[in-house]
């Protein structure tokens, strides 16, 4: 890669030198790319830059907020023709940014991406859904709408990572039964749990992140991610995210919890 024009979003950054930072960029062309560039690149805004380097750590130069036309990668070659790649002037592009509590949701999306996605693996469909999610987070959303936005994005992420959630059958291909109880194991699927009726509620309260009633699973499969099924999907997705992260804490989740305590 030599002086290649990229369009992407900054997911994460770390101090590197006095005037430079280590960036995790989610690019339209190559997926997540690690690079070093001048400090002060903004989050949640489309960036246009140039990347150079043969190894995993690239050099990023001319980092600027992309013009709205360039967010669809108009700056790179199409049909063998190099279009104008002049970066937009930062002050000249009137993008609205994400503010308030929605920032915590956007930070969460960024964190699960930079921690879970492989480097330099193009994911154009997920990149488009990331853009859509950021646009949603710039709008006024109720608590339910915010959670729906996150659950829907997580589902696209699971698909890219190769996880298919089967909710119509258990781990041995028997149909889900409404009056049964199931435990979800990410690498196995839904396992029937043999309990007496009087023990069912106690089991669910002790292992709430992994145990589901059959009737709830059937409803999830029938309706998808809706306000009616949102709490069940949130429980399932959280367990799968934690599994993928090897149960290491998410900093964005901790920030959200701290913010909620001080409200």
Where do the model's predicted regions map?
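Non-catalytic alpha-helical scaffolds and adjoining flexible linkers that form interface surfaces
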Residues: 1-263
């Amino acid at each position: 890669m030599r002086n290649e024009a990229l369009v992407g979003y900054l997911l994460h950054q770390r101090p590197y030198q006095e005037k430079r930072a280590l960036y995790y960029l989610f690019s339209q062309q190559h997926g997540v790319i690690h690079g070093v560039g001048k400090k002060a690149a903004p989050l949640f805004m489309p960036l246009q830059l140039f990347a150079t380097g043969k190894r995993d750590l690239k050099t990023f130069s001319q980092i600027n907020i992309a013009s709205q036309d360039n967010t669809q990668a108009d700056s790179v070659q199409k049909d063998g023709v190099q279009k104008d790649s002049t970066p937009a002037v930062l002050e000249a592009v009137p993008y609205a940014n994400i503010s308030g509590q929605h920032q915590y949701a956007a930070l969460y999306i960024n964190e699960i991406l930079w921690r879970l996605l492989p480097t330099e693996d193009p994911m154009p469909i997920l990149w488009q859904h990331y853009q859509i999610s950021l646009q949603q987070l710039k709008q006024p959303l109720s608590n339910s709408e915010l959670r729906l936005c996150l659950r829907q994005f997580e589902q696209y992420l699971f698909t890219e990572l190769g996880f298919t959630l089967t909710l119509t059958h258990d781990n041995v291909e028997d149909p889900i039964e409404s009056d049964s109880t199931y435990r979800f194991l990410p690498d196995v699927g839904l396992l029937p749990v043999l309990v007496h009726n009087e023990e069912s509620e106690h089991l669910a309260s002790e292992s709430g992140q992994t145990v589901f009633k059959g009737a709830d699973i059937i409803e999830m499969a029938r309706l998808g991610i809706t306000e009616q099924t949102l709490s069940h999907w949130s429980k399932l997705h959280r367990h799968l995210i934690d599994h993928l992260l090897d149960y290491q804490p998410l900093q964005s989740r901790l920030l959200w919890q701290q913010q909620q305590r001080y409200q």
